[in-house]
Amino acid sequence: MSTNQETRGFQSEVKQLLQLMIHSLYSNKEIFLRELISNASDAADKLRFKALSQPELYEGDGELRVRISIDEALGTITISDNGIGMSREQVIDHLGTIAKSGTKEFLNALGSDQAKDSQLIGQFGVGFYSSFIVADKVTVRTRAAGSDASQGVLWESAGEGDYTVADIEKAGRGTDVILHLRDDEKEFLSEWRLRDIIGKYSDHIGLAVEIQTKEYDDEGKETGTKWEKINKAQALWTRSKNEISDEEYKEFYKHISHDFADPLIWSHNKVEGKQEYTSLLYVPSKAPWDLFQREQKHGLKLYVQRVFIMDDVEVFMPNYLRFMRGLLDTNDLPLNVSREILQENKVTQSLRTALTKRSLQMLEKLAKDNIEQYQQFWNAFGLVLKEGVGEDFANKNQVAALVRFASTHTDSSEQAVSLSDYIARMKEGQKAIYFLTADSYQAAKNSPHLELFNKKGIEVLLLSDRIDEWFISHLTEFDGKPLQSITKSDLDLGDLADKEEEETQKVQEAEFASFLERAKGYLGERVKKVVLTHRLTDTPAVVSTDSDEMTTQMAKLFAAMGQQAPEVKYTFELNPEHSMVKRIADIADEAEFNDWIELLFEQALLAERGTLENATAFIKRMNKLLGA
């Protein structure tokens, strides 16, 4: 009998997710059982942890398990666990709302591409709501461990606009999820169909999965039912590696990550000696939707002596490896460890160092053994990995070796060139690794700063990610070679410079001295200086900054973060070989000369910044000079 019954509306995001999920996951509908068993496993883990300090929560029943039963007459499947259970407040919080930051943004990213939506929803983690793929009504009966039998809770919904919640009597702790199957989903009333799904998805979990099966006498007559354990019920990471199949590793990844896609690679290691721990680390094949939400917790599952302690433990991985998934099971931490204790713990620091090293080794091996798969990894997680160059001094060179760049060598926007690749192709006499930062690959590829390098056949790395200016400021050299921006006014080609060209340049500087003086006189304090340049072949002018000054891209980064950046004062460089520059140098009329210098300066600023402060004035001036 139920009391205190109320009907409540779903949070709007839940309604939207339910409709999208039912349609986009229909082809993969059997995962509902995996998700519900996974939830039961989590509930058992949470009870074990709380019972460390409150053993009375076991209520005399310490054999944790999940039981699955079928009622063909009623058309129901019941998934029952004796884990931690839920209070009325927890039921409303967990089953009526989605308490995840960025949920609206996530839902807005979903569209009409069913296959893509399926992957996205899988990454989001549908859990309990997957029940509605096969059921037109779901009933939940639950009681929190340690609460009175009268404090049971009933939750029921048809998966549409609302749900009902009420108080009930429930003798045993834990949760029963009763699925009232749709008429066209009766295939799941087959015991053997359920056995097959459990064998496929849930054999690896440490919780016993039992199914209610019929018993027969010698004559084949049904005599009753019994509970039969149908999974290994041994935590996968405690088993020997040679006993575990690739499929089991993949399914375990999906169990702990709630991702639908297979992982890219994994590493399972048992360490004995000064420290004793087992780690199972995975690199996902796709970036989760919330990867760049800093408030979203990312981390490993922590077990101490095979007892689950907590999820999303971030201290064992540096932030730039936040995409790593997996678990750590250690004997070197106390069972009552808290997040606060972990922060200050020497054991934690030692484990973090070891797990970081292991993760980077996994990526190094992937980059060496499978270029195509590593490219897939880089496309998904490259932006995050770049953060490591500035955040992890101890592993800076290892991280830098894993970074991939677009380059003038490939004529492609794909970031596939490593620093080692670049060094192997360096020209004789070349002492530096040259790079260029810009707003986009197209802007970088078409930058006038490349003209001399293209002419001489010198490779340049093209950086156009938003993080790149920050990233490159922390990477000043690699393998003994300095990294040098080609947009700097004091660019030095060293042994790559042409001696004959240098002599010609000296003559031109004398010829154009008065021209440069006139130009600087007009531009005044708007520029640092006006000089001739020999880095251009097709363009009349560029602007550049000194090596110790803030670059254009860094100033943009400051502005994007809402911070005040120092004003960038450029060197204005003019190409003496260009016909336009030669013509302007001969103009005697001061007003006309100034108009042309202004036009060239604005053109150079536009090429450098991508925008002008006064585009209308620029267009008027250009039209005026073209019509003259």
Swiss-Prot record:
Domain of life from the UniProt record: Bacteria
Chain intervals for the UniProt region annotation (C): 557-628
SMART domains: HATPase_c
CDD domains: HATPase_Hsp90-like
Subunit annotation: Homodimer.
Pfam families: HATPase_c_3, HSP90
Protein name: Chaperone protein HtpG
Gene assigned in the entry: htpG
Region B: start-end pairs: 340-556
Main function: Molecular chaperone. Has ATPase activity.
Species in which this protein is naturally found: Glaesserella parasuis serovar 5 (strain SH0165) (Haemophilus parasuis)
